[in-house]
From Swiss-Prot:
Residues 1-39, 163-346, 737-872, 888-984, 1093-1114, 1130-1173 are annotated as: Disordered. Residues 761-782, 789-799 have a biased composition (Low complexity). The modification Phosphothreonine is found at T868, T908, T1045, T1140, T1145, T1151. It comes from Mus musculus (Mouse). CDD domains: PH_PEPP1_2_3 (cd13248). Residues 953-967 have a biased composition (Basic residues). Residues 815-824, 1141-1155 have a biased composition (Pro residues). Residues 1-22, 270-281, 311-322, 915-926 have a biased composition (Polar residues). The gene is Plekha6. Pfam families: PH. SMART domains: PH. The lineage of its organism: Eukaryota, Metazoa, Chordata, Craniata, Vertebrata. Keywords: Phosphoprotein. This is Pleckstrin homology domain-containing family A member 6.
């Protein structure tokens, strides 16, 4: 064996060997090789109850604390107390505990430190690995302990069994050595002296250890010859082979020197003139070069063949245990060789001088009669074809003994065999080479006729070629025929190379490529290389596989035809079948629709899952883009500061260098950030497109389901299924909309084409949070009492309950009113959708359950007409909807008054009646229509983001406070307050002039016809101001100026009722009259900002340029200054003289907005309260 080969073997020597800890070391009780069945108590491996029993008398090799990686797959390390006794590692919870947590037989394990490929980051870690068992990882507390454990465990794994148990029965010795000479011709190394030098075979190590179930393929394939590799040389020439025989493939310890000379090849004994033609001068285990002797001499020689008996008995027990598990018949059946061949063997005459000392009871196997192995098909699954029985009878008639022949076999490269011939002695003639096709044809004939076995390949015993065949290379057609690179594997030749399989039922033979290769030269049976046989083999195998597959396909097709015929016969003949055919179990519509909706349910689940997943992706990408943008802006600002510093301090020495270095670093970072930002933006765009497509699909699916729900299908179950699907979709969409308010997931862009389910807000008609899905006439199972509750007649025209009224305008997500906080006692009148608690208060109806809230929204009989604004604004007419849309597009919300005007209260009942009537006319009058609610069929605006909403809140608050404080400076109230003022219970608060004017102005405007021209100019100005959005920062300086001006003037309560005695000049009167007119105009403007001109918003064409805004702003500032000046002058005059009161305004001064309502009231009745600060 070469150094290269030896090196390779040394690396894998401990991992290739069977580690049969499943079989206890029970001495054999029969001379027969196949011992009786043993009980299942022979199994001892694993953890706790399945762990091995510790020998209390055995000395403790090493003990200590180690960390062991948990076997659960989790990277968890458990501290355990480990004790190494008798080549087995036991571990406990602590040193005082007696119950064993587990045992690890270390035989044939390879113990070494961990490698980087193991991905173990813990310090002082080492491993014990085996080819067929999982790798155990241990961690010590110091490197010294690690080295000590590695050394101790390594020695236990490389155990050399001392000579013992010399009292092995003699028949067992017969059984140990009988299979030797039947396979291998005499070689040059067969001159070694006798049996007591016979090397110890590694399978003794297989009596213990955690096996993985691969090697026992050989162990039971030829259970009587587990050491065939070694002992085939022992008596092949009549001379027992000495320690020169090579170690078994995969044995944990190589053998000693084969011959005294190490690499010499003595002459063949007894005139044997033949050496293997394909391997000149080779033995069964030929060394490749002379230095292999040194390699072998480095290991102790194997002696004491008596130990083999113990190992053999263990292997027999293993075989019987596996047979017992698989239900294989006992060895006394027809195929047992002991039944046919209890006769002495026949050997050539020239073998007699060197014959074995055990000439008797050497049993042979006839061609095709080998004991069953675990790798063969079960006995009940294999029926011998006639030719097999014929061959068996023929072999029995021909003398009962084996005929030594040479069969040459070209193995397919898929089994990785080396090519060569096998020498087999014949009793009647010198060895010759037979034609290669002899064995191939016979074996292929058996392959084509034997039944398929999907689980286990065929046994090597089922072939008529040579008994030297340790295994049959021709597997069942279910085996894989993919071409693997040629390699020299002796894994089939020796059970030691194939350890016990992991599980009896595991699919371990499906793939042959994971079997470990063995270096060339260790396998003595080489087969000849012949391209013709090789090609013919491939063709025959492919043809046979194709035939088998075609046969299976034909059987399947015939079975399907037969099944369908039987079904038809049953259906046509059975009276019950006729009855069921006549009376279908379900209506046809339901039967078809149920299956459809089962499919739709799966599609909906997949689609909604994709939508949510894509939404998460988009949100993460948005967050990344925002983060990158913030970083970019910070870098740009830092660079800007650096540029400024360079301009300022560029002349200072050494300072510009630092700035330049800093600038360069910032520029590099900025470039990287911009690259990342561009990539993230592109990814976000693509993800958004995908998300929108998915959203469109969900919307289309929702519309389709809604249309199917609207169909006149009188089926409650089907309608419930559809309704459930709609709810599922809307739940997801509403959740996405609420979680992503900035992106506007209410699908406003699809509203034009979505039809009945345009919006996915929480008030969607089919939403589970709204009342449409419960009480709409389209709903198949209404929860409202009356005929609406009948699921079979969901659309009956005589239903007593009114149709669902559309949602109030405050719910429309296009635009929201400002969030001026109302008074505590008036908060219920003004909910603000943009406030954080809006969704909670709005959806739950101020603490009520959602169902009750939906029912109260639905049924006017359960709600008071003056309850909430959703009752006031129940059903907007078309003009109101258009006006509301226009107002939303102008981005100016309705500024609510601080108190509710009496005119509004007086108007509320009629407005409710009128709008409810319109809602009845515009709502559902037939089955095909559904309430439009507040959904616009045309274009819409996506919901504002949170930042925009907060900005609007600040603007409206600032504007409201400005208007209120400016009103405190006005000298007079053009309209006295109505008589219903005490009904509002405003404590310690006096209403300002513009609040008093609102009711009068609204009454005047509502009393007039739309075509009136008396107040056209103020209306145009009011509409223009209504459409303008004045930014609050424009008032920053002016508000402070206006707030500071009244503090400098003391205005007494009697100011408005007093008139100075001194008459004014005509110029002063004209100027004063002009100022009063301007003041009244301003009052009209400020008061009309709170009124929406219903029906007039679309007809007014108002410019939106910034110049008009600035002009109006300047006009207001001038009026404020004039008012302050006038008040100051009047205050000074009143402080000197208190004479007859005279009104500050001329009797001729017009007050158009308030005259119709204020003629019956004294002007100064409430003036003292009006101007009180």
């Amino acid at each position: 064996m070469s150094n290269k080969t030896g090196g390779k073997r040394s690396a894998t020597i401990n991992s290739d060997i069977a580690n049969h800890n499943m079989v206890s070391e029970v001495p054999p009780e029969r001379p027969n090789i196949r011992a009786t069945r043993t009980s299942r108590k022979a199994i001892a491996f694993g953890k706790r109850a399945h762990s091995m029993k510790r020998n209390p008398n055995a000395p403790v090799t090493k003990a200590g604390w180690l960390y062991k990686q948990a076997s659960s797959g989790v990277k968890q390390w458990n501290k355990r107390w480990f004790v190494l006794v008798d080549r087995c590692l036991f571990y406990y919870k602590d040193e005082k505990q007696e119950s064993i947590l587990g045992s690890i037989p270390l035989l044939s394990f390879r113990v070494a430190a961990v490698q980087p490929s193991d991905n173990i980051s813990r310090k002082h870690t080492f491993k014990a690995e085996h080819a067929g068992v999982r790798t155990y990882f241990f961690s010590a507390e110091s490197p010294e302990e690690q080295e000590a454990w590695i050394q101790a465990m390594g020695e236990a794994a490389r155990v050399q069994i001392p000579p013992a148990q010399k009292s092995v029965p003699q028949p067992v010795r017969h059984s140990l050595e009988k299979p030797d000479s039947e396979n291998i011709p005499p070689s040059k190394h067969h001159q070694q002296p006798p049996h007591n030098n016979l090397t110890k075979l590694e399978p003794e190590a297989k009596t213990r250890g955690e096996g993985d179930g691969r090697g026992c393929e050989k162990a039971e394939r030829r259970p009587e010859r587990p050491e065939v590799k070694k002992e085939t040389l022992v008596k092949a020439n009549g001379l027992p082979s000495g320690p020169e025989t090579a170690s078994e493939p995969g044995s944990p310890y190589p053998d000693g020197p084969r011959v005294p000379g190490g690499g010499e090849h003595p002459a063949q004994p007894n005139g044997w003139q033949y050496s293997s033609p394909s391997r000149p001068g080779s033995t069964a285990f030929p060394p490749h070069d002379g230095d292999s002797g040194g390699q072998r001499r480095s290991f102790p020689p194997r002696t004491d063949p008596d130990k083999i008996a113990q190992r053999k008995s263990s292997m027999n027990q293993l075989q019987q245990w596996v047979n017992l598990r698989r239900g294989v018949p006992p060895p006394e059946d027809l195929r047992s060789p002991s039944r046919f061949y209890p006769m002495p063997r026949r050997v050539p005459d020239y073998y007699n001088p060197y014959s074995s000392q055990y000439p008797d009871d050497y049993q042979y196997y006839p061609p095709g009669v080998r004991p069953d192995s675990i790798c063969s098909m079960p006995a009940y699954d294999r029926i011998s074809p006639p030719w097999a029985l014929e061959d068996k009878r023929h072999s029995f008639r021909n003398g009962g003994g084996p005929t030594y022949q040479l069969h040459e076999w070209k193995e397919s490269t898929s089994y990785g065999r080396q090519d060569g011939t096998v020498w087999i002695p014949s009793p009647s003639r010198q060895p010759v080479f037979y034609d290669e096709l002899d064995a191939a044809s016979g074996s292929l004939r058996r392959l084509s006729l034997q039944p398929r076995s999907h689980s286990v390949p065929r046994s090597p015993s089922q072939g008529s070629y040579s008994r030297a065949r340790i295994y049959s290379p021709v597997r069942s057609p279910s085996a894989r025929f993919d071409r693997l690179p040629p390699r020299s594997e002796d894994i089939y030749a020796d059970p030691a190379a194939y350890v016990m399989r992991r599980s009896i039922s595991s699919p371990k033979y499906d793939y042959l490529g994971d079997r470990r290769p063995v270096p060339a030269g260790l396998f003595p049976y080489n087969y000849p290389s012949s391209p013709t046989v090789h090609d013919k083999m491939d063709e025959l195998l492919d043809l046979q596989l194709q035939r088998n597959l075609e046969y299976l396909d034909q059987q399947m097709s015939e079975s399907e035809t037969l099944i369908s015929m039987v079904n038809r016969m049953v259906e046509n003949s059975s009276p019950r079948a006729h009855l069921f055919m006549q009376v279908p179990a379900y209506p046809e519509v339901f039967r078809d629709g149920l299956h459809t909706f089962k499919l739709n349910e799966q599609d909906t689940d997949k689609l909604l899952g994709k939508l949510c997943e894509q939404n998460k992706v988009v949100r993460e990408q948005e967050r990344l883009v925002q983060q990158l943008r913030a970083e970019k802006e910070s870098l740009e600002s830092a660079l800007m500061g650096t540029h400024q510093e360079l301009e300022m301090f560029g002349s200072q020495p050494a300072y510009p260098e630092k700035l330049l270095h800093k600038k360069e670093s910032l520029q590099n970072q900025l470039i990287n950030i911009r690259v990342e930002l561009s990539q993230a933006t592109t990814a976000l765009t693509n993800s958004t497109v995908v998300y929108e497509n998915l959203e469109s699909e969900v919307s289309a699916l929702h519309d389709e389901l809604w249309e199917q729900l609207n169909l006149d299908i009188q089926n409650e179950v089907l309608n419930r299924q559809i309704q459930k699907e709609i709810w599922r979709i809307q739940d997801v969409m509403e959740g996405l909309r609420k979680n992503n308010p900035s992106r506007g997931t209410d699908t406003a862009k699809h509203r034009g084409g979505l039809g009945p389910s345009a919006t996915y807000s929480s008030n969607s008609p089919a939403s589970p949070l709204s009342s449409a899905s419960l009480t709409s006439p389209l709903s198949p199972f209404s929860m409202v009492s009356g005929s609406q509750g009948s699921p079979t007649k969901p659309g009956s025209s005589e239903e007593p309950g009114p149709p669902r009224p559309p949602l109030p305008k405050a719910y429309v997500p296009l635009e929201s009113p400002p969030t001026v906080p109302p008074l505590p006692n008036e908060s219920r009148f003004w909910p603000y959708p943009n406030s954080p608690s809006w969704h909670r208060s709005g959806e739950t109806a101020k603490g009520q359950p959602k169902t009750g809230y939906e029912t109260s929204k639905k049924d006017p009989s359960q709600t008071s007409p003056l309850g909430t604004p959703r009752d006031i604004n129940l059903v907007p007419t078309r003009q109101e909807v258009e006006a509301e849309k226009q107002a939303a597009l102008n981005k100016v919300g309705i500024v609510p008054p601080r108190t509710k005007s009496p005119a509004e209260e007086e108007l509320t009942p009629s407005a409710v009646v009128r709008r409810t009537t319109n809602g009845l006319t515009n709502g559902l009058s037939s089955r095909q229509e559904r309430p439009k609610s507040a959904v616009f069929s045309g274009e819409g605006k996506v919901k504002m983001s949170v930042e925009e909403q907060m900005d609007r809140m600040r603007r409206h608050q600032s504007g409201s406070m400005k208007e209120k404080r400016r009103s405190l400076q006005l000298p007079a109230s053009p309209a006295p307050e109505p008589s219903t003022r005490p009904a509002y219970k405003v404590v310690r608060r006096h209403r300002s002039i513009h609040e008093v004017d609102i009711s009068n102005l609204e009454a005047a405007l509502r009393a007039e016809e739309p075509g009136g021209q008396a107040y056209e100019t103020p209306r145009e100005e009011i509409a223009r101001l209504r459409k303008m959005e004045l930014e609050p920062q424009h008032y920053d300086v002016d508000i402070s100026k206006e707030l500071s001006t009244p503090d400098k003037v003391l205005i007494p309560e009697r100011y408005i009722d007093l008139e100075p005695d001194t008459p004014l000049s005509p110029e002063e009167l004209k100027e004063k009259q002009k100022k009063v007119e301007r003041i009244k105009t301003l009052i009209a403007k400020s008061s009309m900002q709170n009124v929406v001109p219903i029906g007039e918003g679309d007809s007014v064409d108002v410019p939106q340029d910034s110049e008009s805004q600035l002009q109006e702003q300047e006009k207001r500032i001038e009026i404020s200054c004039a008012l302050a000046t006038e008040a100051s002058r009047r205050g000074r005059m009143l402080s000197v003289q208190c004479a007859t009161p005279s009104p500050p305004t001329s009797p001729a001064s017009p007050t158009p907005p308030v005259n119709p309502l204020s003629s019956d009231r004294p002007r100064g009745a409430d003036s003292s309260h009006t101007m009180r600060v």
